Amino acid sequence: MNNLETFFNFTPKKIEIGIFDNQTNNKIYINKLEINFNLNDLDTLTKILNHQLKDLIIEVENKIEQPLEKINLMIENQKTLIIDVSIKKIFDNSEILKSNIEYIIQDLKQQVSKNNPNMKINHILIKEYILNGSRVNKIPIGCVCKDLIIQVQFICLSKDFINCLQNIFRNHQINF
């Protein structure tokens, strides 16, 4: 059963867990705990989750007959910070290399991190590529262009919140 994928979805009103078999796409286990808590009150969150997760993890591990070691964590939090950024790079009729795009995105990531030191970037979404003023539907690697605009969205959460969740799950020997 090493082909299992485990998802935890946290919202202020519930915790949902789903375990799926990657090879067959079958649901192995689905459960929902109705809980009402403030995801921004870290002390209360820690107390509630430590208690609730212990029972849930035991139930899950009994169902899948193996320890739960790694999960995919989805979080719905009102304090999620979404940062939309666009950057224009002049290529002067040069070919776009994969390393060019990686460098541009890494540079944006560093700027977002530097200007938001209390936040952790959880997702980076490339929203759009604009090549010589025209939108393109694929990564423009290998294209020759005058300029390239990349529109990127960074989804961030508080470092304190992420550290709190990591510690809670670490207490149960689970990583995300």
PLM ranges: what are they?
Residues 1-14, 18, 22-70, 75-176:
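Nucleotide/phosphate-binding catalytic cleft detector across ATP-hydrolyzing
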